[in-house]
Amino acid sequence: MPSYRLSHLKQLEAESIHIIREVAVEFENPVMLYSIGKDSSVMVRLAEKAFYPGKVPFPLLHVDSKWKFREMIEFRDSYARENNWGLIVHSNEEAFADGVGPFSHGSQVHTDLMKTQALLQALGKYKFDAAFGGARRDEEKSRAKERIFSFRDRFNQWDPKNQRPELWEIYNTKVHKGESIRVFPISNWTELDIWEYIRLEKIPIVPLYYAKERPVVRVEGNLIMVDDDRMPQEMRARAEMRVVRFRTLGCYPLTGAVESSASTIEEIVAEMMTTTKSERTTRVIDFDQEASMEQKKREGYF
Protein backbone atom coordinates (compact mmCIF):
# COMPACT_ATOMS: atom_id res chain seq x y z
CA MET A 1 0.00 0.00 0.00
CA PRO A 2 1.59 3.32 -1.03
CA SER A 3 2.34 5.78 1.78
CA TYR A 4 0.73 9.21 1.81
CA ARG A 5 2.91 12.15 2.78
CA LEU A 6 1.98 15.80 2.95
CA SER A 7 4.28 18.35 1.39
CA HIS A 8 6.03 20.86 3.65
CA LEU A 9 3.51 23.60 2.82
CA LYS A 10 0.53 21.30 3.30
CA GLN A 11 1.85 20.27 6.73
CA LEU A 12 2.08 23.93 7.73
CA GLU A 13 -1.39 24.55 6.32
CA ALA A 14 -2.86 21.62 8.28
CA GLU A 15 -1.25 22.82 11.53
CA SER A 16 -2.58 26.36 11.05
CA ILE A 17 -6.09 25.17 10.22
CA HIS A 18 -6.07 22.98 13.34
CA ILE A 19 -5.12 26.02 15.46
CA ILE A 20 -7.80 28.24 13.91
CA ARG A 21 -10.50 25.61 14.48
CA GLU A 22 -9.32 25.07 18.06
CA VAL A 23 -9.82 28.75 18.84
CA ALA A 24 -13.23 28.86 17.14
CA VAL A 25 -14.40 25.99 19.36
CA GLU A 26 -12.82 27.05 22.66
CA PHE A 27 -13.53 30.80 22.70
CA GLU A 28 -16.80 32.70 22.67
CA ASN A 29 -15.84 35.81 20.71
CA PRO A 30 -12.62 35.53 18.67
CA VAL A 31 -11.41 38.00 16.05
CA MET A 32 -8.72 37.92 13.36
CA LEU A 33 -6.38 40.91 13.30
CA TYR A 34 -5.92 42.07 9.73
CA SER A 35 -2.87 44.22 8.98
CA ILE A 36 -3.40 44.05 5.18
CA GLY A 37 0.07 42.52 4.77
CA LYS A 38 1.18 39.25 3.21
CA ASP A 39 0.98 37.30 6.49
CA SER A 40 -2.56 38.50 7.16
CA SER A 41 -3.55 37.58 3.61
CA VAL A 42 -2.26 34.03 4.14
CA MET A 43 -4.01 33.82 7.52
CA VAL A 44 -7.31 34.92 5.97
CA ARG A 45 -7.01 32.24 3.28
CA LEU A 46 -6.32 29.61 5.98
CA ALA A 47 -9.43 30.72 7.90
CA GLU A 48 -11.53 30.42 4.75
CA LYS A 49 -10.20 26.90 4.20
CA ALA A 50 -10.75 25.96 7.84
CA PHE A 51 -14.51 26.49 7.58
CA TYR A 52 -15.22 25.93 3.89
CA PRO A 53 -17.91 25.71 2.57
CA GLY A 54 -19.35 27.45 5.60
CA LYS A 55 -18.87 31.07 6.63
CA VAL A 56 -15.90 32.02 8.81
CA PRO A 57 -17.42 32.49 12.30
CA PHE A 58 -15.47 35.59 13.30
CA PRO A 59 -14.77 39.05 11.81
CA LEU A 60 -11.58 40.78 10.71
CA LEU A 61 -10.27 43.70 12.76
CA HIS A 62 -7.99 46.32 11.25
CA VAL A 63 -6.38 48.75 13.67
CA ASP A 64 -5.97 51.80 11.44
CA SER A 65 -3.16 54.10 12.57
CA LYS A 66 -4.20 56.65 9.90
CA TRP A 67 -0.65 56.44 8.47
CA LYS A 68 -0.85 53.30 6.36
CA PHE A 69 0.16 53.44 2.71
CA ARG A 70 -2.74 54.60 0.54
CA GLU A 71 -2.45 51.43 -1.57
CA MET A 72 -2.95 49.36 1.58
CA ILE A 73 -6.25 51.05 2.45
CA GLU A 74 -7.49 50.73 -1.14
CA PHE A 75 -6.61 47.02 -1.11
CA ARG A 76 -8.26 46.49 2.31
CA ASP A 77 -11.56 48.00 1.27
CA SER A 78 -11.77 46.22 -2.09
CA TYR A 79 -10.72 42.85 -0.64
CA ALA A 80 -13.28 42.95 2.18
CA ARG A 81 -16.01 44.03 -0.21
CA GLU A 82 -15.26 41.47 -2.93
CA ASN A 83 -14.88 38.57 -0.47
CA ASN A 84 -17.85 39.49 1.75
CA TRP A 85 -15.77 39.61 4.92
CA GLY A 86 -17.10 41.27 8.06
CA LEU A 87 -14.47 43.99 8.59
CA ILE A 88 -14.17 46.16 11.69
CA VAL A 89 -11.93 49.21 11.36
CA HIS A 90 -10.91 50.92 14.60
CA SER A 91 -8.70 53.94 15.28
CA ASN A 92 -7.71 55.90 18.35
CA GLU A 93 -9.74 58.92 17.25
CA GLU A 94 -8.87 60.99 20.32
CA ALA A 95 -5.13 60.67 19.73
CA PHE A 96 -5.58 61.33 16.01
CA ALA A 97 -7.60 64.47 16.77
CA ASP A 98 -4.73 65.61 19.00
CA GLY A 99 -2.42 65.37 15.99
CA VAL A 100 -0.42 62.33 17.06
CA GLY A 101 1.76 61.04 14.23
CA PRO A 102 5.21 59.61 13.54
CA PHE A 103 6.70 62.90 12.30
CA SER A 104 5.38 65.07 15.13
CA HIS A 105 5.60 62.65 18.06
CA GLY A 106 8.16 60.02 17.04
CA SER A 107 7.77 56.31 16.48
CA GLN A 108 7.42 55.27 20.15
CA VAL A 109 4.54 57.59 21.05
CA HIS A 110 2.82 57.07 17.70
CA THR A 111 3.02 53.27 17.95
CA ASP A 112 1.81 53.23 21.54
CA LEU A 113 -1.19 55.50 21.01
CA MET A 114 -2.22 54.69 17.44
CA LYS A 115 -1.50 50.96 17.44
CA THR A 116 -1.18 49.47 20.94
CA GLN A 117 -3.79 51.61 22.69
CA ALA A 118 -6.07 51.50 19.65
CA LEU A 119 -5.90 47.70 19.66
CA LEU A 120 -6.70 47.54 23.37
CA GLN A 121 -9.63 49.92 22.84
CA ALA A 122 -11.06 47.68 20.11
CA LEU A 123 -10.60 44.46 22.09
CA GLY A 124 -12.39 46.04 25.04
CA LYS A 125 -15.14 47.68 23.00
CA TYR A 126 -16.15 44.48 21.23
CA LYS A 127 -15.24 42.17 24.15
CA PHE A 128 -13.07 39.84 22.07
CA ASP A 129 -11.56 37.06 24.18
CA ALA A 130 -9.12 35.75 21.55
CA ALA A 131 -7.32 37.55 18.73
CA PHE A 132 -5.49 35.88 15.86
CA GLY A 133 -2.27 37.57 14.77
CA GLY A 134 0.04 36.96 11.83
CA ALA A 135 3.38 37.01 13.68
CA ARG A 136 6.02 34.42 12.78
CA ARG A 137 8.91 33.16 14.89
CA ASP A 138 11.53 33.81 12.21
CA GLU A 139 10.76 37.54 12.14
CA GLU A 140 12.25 38.76 15.40
CA LYS A 141 13.78 37.38 18.62
CA SER A 142 10.91 38.21 21.01
CA ARG A 143 8.46 36.55 18.63
CA ALA A 144 10.77 33.54 18.38
CA LYS A 145 10.20 32.70 22.05
CA GLU A 146 6.47 33.44 22.13
CA ARG A 147 4.02 30.55 22.25
CA ILE A 148 1.38 29.96 19.58
CA PHE A 149 -1.26 30.55 22.28
CA SER A 150 0.08 33.70 23.96
CA PHE A 151 -1.79 34.55 27.14
CA ARG A 152 -2.40 38.12 28.32
CA ASP A 153 -3.42 39.15 31.83
CA ARG A 154 -6.40 41.37 32.66
CA PHE A 155 -4.25 44.38 31.74
CA ASN A 156 -3.52 42.83 28.31
CA GLN A 157 0.15 42.45 29.24
CA TRP A 158 2.41 39.60 28.11
CA ASP A 159 4.77 37.93 30.57
CA PRO A 160 7.39 35.94 28.62
CA LYS A 161 8.39 34.11 31.83
CA ASN A 162 4.86 32.85 32.40
CA GLN A 163 4.05 30.85 29.28
CA ARG A 164 2.36 27.48 29.04
CA PRO A 165 3.92 24.37 27.49
CA GLU A 166 2.59 23.33 24.07
CA LEU A 167 3.46 19.66 23.76
CA TRP A 168 2.24 17.47 20.89
CA GLU A 169 0.06 20.30 19.51
CA ILE A 170 -2.12 20.20 22.62
CA TYR A 171 -3.06 23.71 23.72
CA ASN A 172 -4.30 24.93 27.10
CA THR A 173 -7.00 27.46 26.27
CA LYS A 174 -8.30 28.13 29.78
CA VAL A 175 -8.26 31.74 30.92
CA HIS A 176 -9.50 33.52 34.02
CA LYS A 177 -12.13 36.23 33.85
CA GLY A 178 -10.67 39.36 32.28
CA GLU A 179 -7.76 37.53 30.68
CA SER A 180 -7.43 37.02 26.95
CA ILE A 181 -5.26 35.28 24.42
CA ARG A 182 -3.39 36.17 21.24
CA VAL A 183 -3.06 33.26 18.84
CA PHE A 184 -0.44 32.99 16.10
CA PRO A 185 -1.42 30.20 13.69
CA ILE A 186 1.49 30.83 11.30
CA SER A 187 4.18 30.95 14.01
CA ASN A 188 6.14 28.10 12.42
CA TRP A 189 6.09 29.51 8.90
CA THR A 190 9.07 31.34 7.40
CA GLU A 191 8.98 34.31 5.05
CA LEU A 192 9.84 31.94 2.20
CA ASP A 193 6.96 29.63 3.21
CA ILE A 194 4.60 32.60 3.08
CA TRP A 195 5.64 33.54 -0.44
CA GLU A 196 5.53 29.97 -1.71
CA TYR A 197 2.01 29.60 -0.29
CA ILE A 198 0.91 32.88 -1.89
CA ARG A 199 2.23 31.53 -5.19
CA LEU A 200 0.54 28.14 -4.69
CA GLU A 201 -2.83 29.58 -3.68
CA LYS A 202 -2.69 32.63 -5.98
CA ILE A 203 -3.49 34.90 -3.03
CA PRO A 204 -3.94 38.59 -3.95
CA ILE A 205 -1.55 40.96 -2.16
CA VAL A 206 -0.88 44.70 -1.97
CA PRO A 207 1.08 45.86 -5.06
CA LEU A 208 3.69 47.49 -2.80
CA TYR A 209 5.31 44.06 -2.43
CA TYR A 210 6.33 44.16 -6.10
CA ALA A 211 9.33 46.13 -7.33
CA LYS A 212 8.54 49.41 -9.05
CA GLU A 213 10.10 52.83 -9.44
CA ARG A 214 8.98 54.86 -6.41
CA PRO A 215 9.96 58.18 -4.75
CA VAL A 216 12.00 57.46 -1.62
CA VAL A 217 14.01 59.42 0.94
CA ARG A 218 16.96 57.93 2.82
CA VAL A 219 16.35 58.33 6.56
CA GLU A 220 18.86 56.80 8.99
CA GLY A 221 19.67 54.01 6.55
CA ASN A 222 16.06 53.29 5.56
CA LEU A 223 14.44 54.12 2.22
CA ILE A 224 11.18 55.81 3.23
CA MET A 225 8.63 56.25 0.47
CA VAL A 226 6.91 59.59 -0.10
CA ASP A 227 3.24 58.59 0.12
CA ASP A 228 1.48 61.88 0.85
CA ASP A 229 2.12 65.53 1.64
CA ARG A 230 2.14 64.94 5.40
CA MET A 231 5.84 64.13 5.04
CA PRO A 232 7.73 67.36 5.87
CA GLN A 233 8.68 69.41 2.84
CA GLU A 234 12.40 69.33 3.69
CA MET A 235 12.29 65.53 3.53
CA ARG A 236 10.24 65.41 0.33
CA ALA A 237 12.75 67.74 -1.30
CA ARG A 238 15.40 65.02 -0.95
CA ALA A 239 13.29 62.34 -2.65
CA GLU A 240 14.78 60.34 -5.51
CA MET A 241 13.26 57.74 -7.80
CA ARG A 242 14.48 54.18 -7.17
CA VAL A 243 13.27 50.71 -8.10
CA VAL A 244 12.19 49.31 -4.73
CA ARG A 245 9.70 47.00 -3.11
CA PHE A 246 8.55 46.34 0.46
CA ARG A 247 9.13 43.09 2.35
CA THR A 248 6.86 44.20 5.19
CA LEU A 249 4.13 46.84 5.41
CA GLY A 250 3.16 49.24 8.17
CA CYS A 251 2.90 52.99 8.68
CA TYR A 252 4.64 54.51 5.68
CA PRO A 253 7.02 56.86 7.60
CA LEU A 254 8.20 53.89 9.70
CA THR A 255 8.61 51.25 6.99
CA GLY A 256 11.70 51.04 4.80
CA ALA A 257 11.75 49.77 1.24
CA VAL A 258 14.47 47.53 -0.20
CA GLU A 259 16.12 47.97 -3.55
CA SER A 260 14.98 45.06 -5.69
CA SER A 261 14.00 44.16 -9.23
CA ALA A 262 11.59 41.39 -8.14
CA SER A 263 8.32 42.31 -9.84
CA THR A 264 6.64 38.87 -9.90
CA ILE A 265 5.90 36.19 -7.31
CA GLU A 266 8.48 33.89 -8.92
CA GLU A 267 11.17 36.57 -8.68
CA ILE A 268 10.29 37.30 -5.04
CA VAL A 269 10.53 33.58 -4.16
CA ALA A 270 13.92 33.41 -5.89
CA GLU A 271 15.06 36.49 -3.96
CA MET A 272 13.97 34.91 -0.66
CA MET A 273 16.17 31.91 -1.39
CA THR A 274 19.30 34.04 -0.98
CA THR A 275 18.35 36.73 1.54
CA THR A 276 20.03 36.59 4.95
CA LYS A 277 18.20 39.37 6.82
CA SER A 278 14.75 39.40 8.42
CA GLU A 279 12.14 41.66 6.87
CA ARG A 280 11.76 43.33 10.28
CA THR A 281 15.13 45.07 9.79
CA THR A 282 13.23 47.64 7.71
CA ARG A 283 10.69 48.44 10.48
CA VAL A 284 11.75 51.53 12.44
CA ILE A 285 9.60 50.62 15.47
CA ASP A 286 11.67 47.51 16.13
CA PHE A 287 14.73 49.63 16.92
CA ASP A 288 13.41 52.75 18.63
CA GLN A 289 14.49 51.47 22.07
CA GLU A 290 16.43 48.57 23.55
CA ALA A 291 14.48 45.26 23.42
CA SER A 292 11.90 47.32 21.56
CA MET A 293 9.52 44.63 20.30
CA GLU A 294 9.47 42.66 23.56
CA GLN A 295 8.70 45.82 25.53
CA LYS A 296 5.88 46.71 23.16
CA LYS A 297 4.41 43.21 23.46
CA ARG A 298 4.57 43.44 27.26
CA GLU A 299 2.49 46.61 26.96
CA GLY A 300 -0.16 44.95 24.79
CA TYR A 301 1.18 45.29 21.24
CA PHE A 302 0.37 42.64 18.61
UniProtKB/Swiss-Prot annotation:
Catalytic activity of the protein: sulfate + ATP + H(+) = adenosine 5'-phosphosulfate + diphosphate
Keyword terms: ATP-binding, Nucleotide-binding, Nucleotidyltransferase, Transferase
Biological processes per GO annotation: hydrogen sulfide biosynthetic process; sulfate assimilation
TM annotation in the entry: none
Pathways involved: Sulfur metabolism; hydrogen sulfide biosynthesis; sulfite from sulfate: step 1/3
Disulfide bonds: none
UniProt keyword annotation of Protease present: no
Keyword flag Iron-sulfur: no
Protein EC: 2.7.7.4
Single GO MF annotation: ATP binding
Entry function: With CysN forms the ATP sulfurylase (ATPS) that catalyzes the adenylation of sulfate producing adenosine 5'-phosphosulfate (APS) and diphosphate, the first enzymatic step in sulfur assimilation pathway. APS synthesis involves the formation of a high-energy phosphoric-sulfuric acid anhydride bond driven by GTP hydrolysis by CysN coupled to ATP hydrolysis by CysD.
Oligomeric form and interacting partners: Heterodimer composed of CysD, the smaller subunit, and CysN.
Family designation: Belongs to the PAPS reductase family. CysD subfamily.
Name of the protein: Sulfate adenylyltransferase subunit 2
Gene: cysD
